[in-house]
């Protein structure tokens, strides 16, 4: 496992808040390394990480309930600065002798706090005697502060909206500074890590690149590494970073399942072979995948079929590479990101409903008995893009919209055929071309065309047509967890629809999807 030591870091103890990852994002944006660990293993994480400061997250539990989560005593014994947020405020105060009660007026949504006393927590942007908007989400509240604490700010239903023991560097907020609805929340978190904890902004992708190259060389030695290349940003950045570290000890395998966008496979193969000179095995498996998918209309069966075939094809190619006389690869590279790591050790540890199966190479390590090389496992998606820029990847590649592993198979509801895929590729290319011409590509999180399993009557010239319906989808989002449809003007939609109908044989009607997530998902399948 490829990991870096971080002497100057922040530990975030997760008590189950749905927005804990946003705390980490804000801290990273401030140039400071941090890790999230669930409260169940926080003591072990604290001892291992040796952080310079700790943040207690919010959470759904009530501090007044028997057996509700607590922070490890070792954190208090260490005397490092602490910031408690919402539930984090309540458990910190409870554990230090304060009182928390339920049944008072709750606050959910926007609230205004009144600053009663100056504090380094908001030095430079909030002033004593003034009010500022924040985002609250609490039912319980602190009714008695621990010894040594004083009120810094209040709100209508939170007498201790901010409370602190500045001598011990303990700070608490009843509101959530990590969410965008608290306009100055990012500055507050930055002040905590810089002015209170005293850390510098030394978490950069340049430093990460140099240290990760050293760690990869240390882990791999003279061994060979295989990388399953999808053509997406994550696996591409991982491959280029590993190649920079160990050169031709890396071999990439690109399995072309025949479900990519127009010209995409050629672009990926050309970039890796010609521009980066990375050893690449290009497997044209379109006939295999499309043959197995013939007549399959259930989206879950599609996803699982694609995942199974990918593993089978990759294993076969790995066996060929192992027999080339240069030694069998002992390492498997994956583009695992930090959110994947967090979710694998979730706060609750309980089951969750599977909305859609995720197509990835998760089944490969156990089956192939290989050690993992995961150079991105400490990074969020935006940091991966920043690392890609640091490595010199073109912006046109780094800024590409997300594309699902099963490819166009899930943008073609119902049974797929080569003819349908060709129609969809052309429509999708025209749609994205119009988006780029309008200067909207970087504004939109994700945009794509969907070919519906529905045919409608149309008229072209003097002839009746009976062709497919194409749906256009475009959403704005921060992280893909929630999304809103993009509000195009009608002139744009008219241009895109006209081009698609005129230039793509097989489509005679175009519609626009105005569903947000939730209740819908971004992809149609």
From Swiss-Prot:
It comes from the Bacteria. ATP binds at residues 230-236. Residues 203-400 form the GMPS ATP-PPase domain. Pfam families: GATase, GMP_synt_C, tRNA_Me_trans. Residues 9-202 form the Glutamine amidotransferase type-1 domain. One of its GO terms (cellular component) is cytosol. Its EC number is 6.3.5.2. GO terms for molecular function: ATP binding; GMP synthase activity. Pathway: Purine metabolism; GMP biosynthesis; GMP from XMP (L-Gln route): step 1/1. It catalyses: XMP + L-glutamine + ATP + H2O = GMP + L-glutamate + AMP + diphosphate + 2 H(+). The keyword NADP does not apply. InterPro entries: Class_I_gatase-like, GATASE, GMP_synth_C, GMP_synth_GATase, GMP_synthase, GMPS_ATP_PPase_dom, Rossmann-like_a/b/a_fold. Coiled coil: none annotated. The keyword DNA-binding does not apply. Keywords: ATP-binding, Glutamine amidotransferase, GMP biosynthesis, Ligase, Nucleotide-binding, Purine biosynthesis. It is an enzyme of class 6 (ligase). The active site is at 86 (nucleophile), 176, 178. NCBIfam families: guaA_Cterm, guaA_Nterm, PRK00074.1. Catalyzes the synthesis of GMP from XMP. Homodimer. This is GMP synthase [glutamine-hydrolyzing]. It comes from Agrobacterium fabrum (strain C58 / ATCC 33970).
């Amino acid at each position: 496992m490829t990991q870096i030591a971080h002497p100057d870091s922040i530990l975030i103890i997760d008590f189950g808040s749905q927005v804990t990852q946003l705390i980490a994002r804000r801290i990273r944006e401030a140039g400071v390394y941090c890790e999230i660990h669930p409260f169940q293993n926080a003591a072990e994480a604290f001892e291992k990480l040796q952080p310079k400061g700790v943040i207690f997250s919010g959470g759904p539990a009530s501090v007044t309930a028997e057996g509700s989560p607590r922070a490890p005593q070792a954190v208090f014994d260490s005397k490092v600065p602490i910031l408690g947020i919402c539930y984090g405020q309540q458990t910190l105060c409870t554990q230090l002798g304060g009182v928390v009660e339920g049944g008072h007026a709750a606050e959910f949504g926007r609230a205004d706090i009144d600053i009663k006393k100056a504090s380094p927590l908001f030095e430079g942007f909030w002033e004593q005697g003034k009010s500022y908007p924040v985002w609250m989400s609490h039912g319980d509240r602190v009714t008695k502060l621990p010894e040594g604490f004083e009120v810094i700010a209040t709100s209508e239903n939170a007498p201790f909206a901010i409370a602190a023991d500045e001598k011990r560097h303990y700070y608490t907020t009843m509101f959530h500074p990590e969410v965008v609805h608290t306009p100055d929340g990012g500055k507050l978190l930055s002040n905590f890590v810089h002015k209170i904890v005293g850390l510098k902004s030394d978490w950069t992708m340049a430093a990460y690149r140099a240290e990760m190259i050293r760690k990869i060389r240390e882990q791999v030695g003279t061994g060979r590494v295989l990388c399953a290349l999808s053509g997406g940003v994550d696996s591409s950045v991982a491959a280029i970073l590993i190649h920079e570290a160990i050169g031709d000890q890396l071999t990439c395998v690109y399995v072309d399942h025949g479900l990519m966008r127009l010209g995409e496979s050629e672009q990926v193969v050309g970039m890796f072979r010609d521009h980066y000179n990375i050893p690449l095995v290009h497997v044209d498996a379109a006939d295999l995948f499309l043959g197995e998918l013939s007549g399959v209309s259930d989206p879950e069966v599609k996803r699982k079929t694609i995942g199974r075939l990918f593993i089978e094809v990759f294993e076969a190619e790995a066996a060929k590479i192992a027999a080339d006389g240069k030694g069998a690869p002992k390492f498997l590279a994956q583009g695992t990101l930090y959110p994947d790591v967090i979710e694998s050790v979730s706060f609750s540890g309980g089951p969750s409903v599977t909305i859609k199966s995720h197509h990835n190479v998760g089944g490969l390590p156990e089956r192939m008995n290989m050690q993992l090389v995961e150079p991105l496992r400490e990074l969020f998606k935006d940091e991966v893009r920043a690392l890609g820029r640091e490595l010199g990847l073109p912006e046109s590649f780094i800024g590409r919209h997300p594309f699902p592993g099963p490819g166009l198979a899930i943008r073609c509801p119902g049974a797929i055929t080569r003819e349908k895929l060709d129609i969809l590729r052309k429509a999708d290319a025209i749609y994205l071309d119009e988006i780029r011409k309008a200067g909207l590509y970087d504004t939109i999180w994700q945009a794509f065309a969907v070919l519906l399993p529905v045919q409608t009557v149309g008229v072209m010239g003097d002839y009746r047509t009976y062709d497919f319906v194409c749906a256009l989808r475009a959403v704005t989002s921060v992280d893909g967890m929630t999304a809103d449809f993009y509000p195009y003007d009608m002139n744009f939609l008219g241009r895109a629809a006209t081009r698609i109908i005129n230039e793509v044989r097989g489509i005679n009607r175009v519609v626009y999807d105005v569903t947000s997530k939730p209740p819908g998902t971004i992809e149609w399948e």
